[in-house]
């Protein structure tokens, strides 16, 4: 490994690089390789300046790795590259070959130009398939540095060039490389030092095909081998032979062509064939070759030509080269001469003097065998006989010419020699001729004789081989005969190194059928004599074979030195038939055999005596060995080495031979077999004292214990087996029973709970759509408590919910459980979250219906450029307005009482006066998102993309029907009250409060933007022109809600009493003391705002006292009630005092209340908040009777205030603007509820409107004890207060209606000057408690009725451009800006003004139609709907029924008043219509013709960039658009068409045109995507 310090120094000095994972991926990317390391099989890391190999473990599939031209000094970190085949490491700094053990598939290794001094670690055991090694330009010097190449058995390509090798011994290393084919040694000193460098290496490397820069051809190898055999002369001959062969090949090719031509020519015209150009040289070469052949044959005993002479075929010499007369004969003669030269050159010759014999012995013997085999094969072929005769003739003629004195000697017969026996010679010649001619019927051939002799030898002594042996045949074969085959061969070969049999074999194998010369015949005679002697010796040896065999059996172990010689014995014994045969032929051989037999006998006698001596010595050794064994036995207490057999446990000295054989090794066993048993063993070895040895006793004890333990173990195993079987049976039964029980119990419980939950939830969702509740507001029925039915045990059902919703109630509060179930049902939907498909469908249908118009042609006049310019202008104006609003809000941030700080990664509320920390209202999941949005919105540039982080919960517009201002509201109300009581102390606060309004918009609108925004709400607000000018009417409810939040903020968690500061307590006492004075003053004052503030203040004071008393009384009962709550089932409903904050549209209340009731509007805010304990029928009362149905938790005073508030809201919401600054100090009241503007139940899972797009009031943080007190104990008292409020409300209705007329006039004057874009549809949020069961009741009107009214009224007030702008925003999507919903209302051109003027003329007719709609609305809410209360409220059903009558009476009165005012045509008429209907409320003013609408629209467009919180007075004309939820698609369209038919037929005409809309859609990344949608819709125009 690279040392870090060394690597760091090197990097500092030379700037070397390291192999990093990122760098490797970059290189792969550059070379277009895979980014996944294991997918690459090649990697190029050359020329990178790397200093070590590292970080390659992930490249496990590499087959080729290039690391050349780096600075690598060590081969390392290649253990994971097990499939590497090629490794290139040239041009590096490597000094040692190592660490390649794991690369066993390496085939090519290049280490050239490194610093290696020794080849190592590349043997076949390490790199078994290494084929190529390039190690040029290193520091290799001698054979020691190359010694490891001997181990490379598979290396075939070796490049050692340009090293420093100078040792000629490397040739021996190359000889031991069997696969070496390519060798490069150039550039080394050894090339010049090695004599005959190229020939030597070619001879040393048998498989070499390429040396240095040239190939090794077969001719080169043949010349080198000739040079090795015969020196330079042999090499010259070999070269000539190759040249002749090449010339002959060419000549034969030409002659064959000539012959083909001569076939078609006449004899005189034939072309002569080509003759050999070197025939004379060939003749000389033939003569010299003959002489060399004679010398060689005479020296090595070859008698081929002698036999030819003896056969008398010398007359065949007539055929010679000179006798051929034609060119063809000459050519054939030349060819024969070539063949003769080739054969002569291949025959064995005597090595030349001066050459080392060691290098050539092996090659010469090999050549000899090859030549002999070739000659024998040729001689055995009868077809070659004439040619051989010609050759022999030539040889004999040359021989007789050169040596004439020897010729007569060949025919002389020596009387004392074998030559006198002419009959024998004739018989021999006849036999040889028959064999040569292929006659197999004659005498047997030498091979047949040989096989016959071998068979007879085995027959002669095989039967008597084991006669006298005392041992059994099996034992003898297994033990002694093993070595007998190798050792039992006795002969006297010591005297002669070459036996006669060997000579005879040579004679048989080398015999040829050529005529023999005299020298050959003489040599043959000598061989025959030797053969006779050998046969005689063999016969004599066979007679003593039995004795020799007996000696071998006795002394087998002593014959190891003679084993190899004895192996020749069977082949010698087969000479017996030959002996007899030879005796018949030659008397001389018989005499020689007799002499030889005598000598053999003498030798055998000597061997016997020697054997006896050896036997005697062996007996002495045996005795000493036995004595030593006894001593060892005594020393070891006679414990045997091994116990074996039955009854053989005796001391080792008493073991019998069989046991000894099994105990001893093979040699000792043979000694025991061959040894003579001593008769006095017992005398030599004294027996032990006792027969029972310690080993025997120990063995007996051990055997007994073993048997006993074996029995016990067997019994125990059986017992355990039985127990296991029984346990398995019991376990299987028990498992089945438990499994069945668990399945049944779990299924029964889980299925029951899930079925009930799902049924309730699904029924509520379906009922919600019918009753026009907001989408995503899922009221839940009664749900069993977590204690009774826990969700920890997973039901055996198919999982229908996401993993994070599988345990909805585990460790969660009631609110979190509700949130979880709501997410569950949202996830069950097939469409996007927070949206319902049927709502989309109905909106599209309604849009098509209401956009059917004849004036669509006007839209086609607009070009894309003009529309784009207009849109850009609107967007720029909106951005400027938003930036200004944000800047003002940020500038006033220091004037708040409370601030927000991040504490422990959470956003906390810091009280300015006390410094206490409060958590933001739950749920925590949404708070963090809200605060993050708040930080984003503080940046001016963030307004365009504010909706990007709100993909799950769409943002709602800033300009919304209601903007709660909790912090500023509390401050404002307190300051107003203190101003009236102590004017000199609080005179400067109203201005500040007004300046701070925008900041509070931003502060408290964020949470609402986290709610589940509804598509319809934004759509309605875009169409609601009434809300543009009447937004300030909601100020009364807003102010009261702020005070309510301020009051709740004072109640810290865990306290049962109000925690007020001293200043607040003093202020409260002053308010209480001056309560009656203020009330009288306000009664005398004609200003409705002052009177309303006073009433609200009185209600707040009264409510404060009631809360304090209730808290003290119920403090003792908190623990008991807590236990009851825990033991009872958890009700996921809103009935028992759960505080949900829902916004109600102020106009939805004013439609059915007399205008005089406004004075009680502010009081209704504080009173409505007390309805949290009950409220099951509050919404029903609101829809049917004009005021919320009283609940047991609401006092009568609150009810009266609520009614007055509704009546006041009916007469004009905008009149609240002028009175906001004079509101008295009103403290928050616990139990307030934020009311939805769509008359639907709020989303109880989030504490803010489920579908409205404005920020909700922050819910109070009240201690659980205080909540329990409100839940359980304020019910009866609240019921009494409800009845009192009802009475007071009736008395105050008349006065309020009278005051409303005056207020309308006042607001009318302020409207023109104060119209602002911020006065977009705003809704007064009257707090009222709504239970869960209440949310499921029918609301004011179904969705189909709303859509019908929309279709019939919308086109009367909007010109086509305004309608297009209206549709340019996607439903329910908002970018979170103040005036985003007014983009369609801010830019009116002349056409829009004309349309509005024409629309104003239809006021009277519309008023009549609205009267009819009011009647229809009242009919839609039948008293029967009140029966839809869930079982949760059954205990209070009676009290509710009692209150219902009173409310219905009041509702009837209010309805009568409304109808009267509508008939008269007063300006208040238009504000009495239900907000759920699409209405046009236009007072019958004489100034309409003068263009008040144009002024109003111009003023609104100018104020678009100003503060959105400037509230204009009551407008003269406005269109009210309220939120609704459509019903099922099957109902909606039909009802819509049915509803709009009568109105359209009397007032409008329909025209179908095509309109394009730009919809702002949030994609998955949170970015705003503008989609252009074309819709064909039916728009109604005047």
From Swiss-Prot:
* Listed Acidic residues bias regions: 572-582, 928-942, 1529-1540
Instruction: Specify where the region named Disordered lies, as residue ranges.
Output: 245-420, 560-587, 859-878, 913-942, 1073-1092, 1101-1137, 1150-1218, 1305-1345, 1358-1438, 1484-1517, 1529-1548
The record's LRR repeats, renumbered to this chain, cover: 38-60, 61-82, 83-104, 105-126, 129-150, 154-175
What domain of life?
A: Eukaryota
Q: Which segments show compositional bias classed as Low complexity?
A: 313-327, 1166-1178
Q: Which UniProt keywords apply?
A: Cell projection, Cilium, Leucine-rich repeat, Repeat
Repeat among keywords:
yes
Q: Name one GO molecular function term.
A: dynein complex binding
Domain named LRRCT: which ranges?
A: 189-227
User: Does the record bear Transcription in its keywords?
Assistant: no
Give the main localization category.
Answer: other
Q: Where in the cell is it found?
A: Cell projection, Cilium
Biological-process GO terms, alphabetical:
axoneme assembly; cilium assembly
This entry carries the following GO cellular component terms, namely: axoneme
Signal sequence, start to end = none
Bias type Basic and acidic residues, positions: 339-392, 1078-1092, 1103-1125, 1321-1335, 1398-1427, 1484-1514
Extract the PANTHER family matched here.
Answer: LEUCINE-RICH REPEAT-CONTAINING PROTEIN 46 (PTHR45973:SF9), PROTEIN PHOSPHATASE 1 REGULATORY SUBUNIT SDS22-RELATED (PTHR45973)
Function per UniProt: Cilium-specific protein required for cilia structures.
The identity of this protein, by name, is Dynein axonemal assembly factor 1 homolog
Organism placement in taxonomy: Eukaryota, Metazoa, Ecdysozoa, Arthropoda, Hexapoda
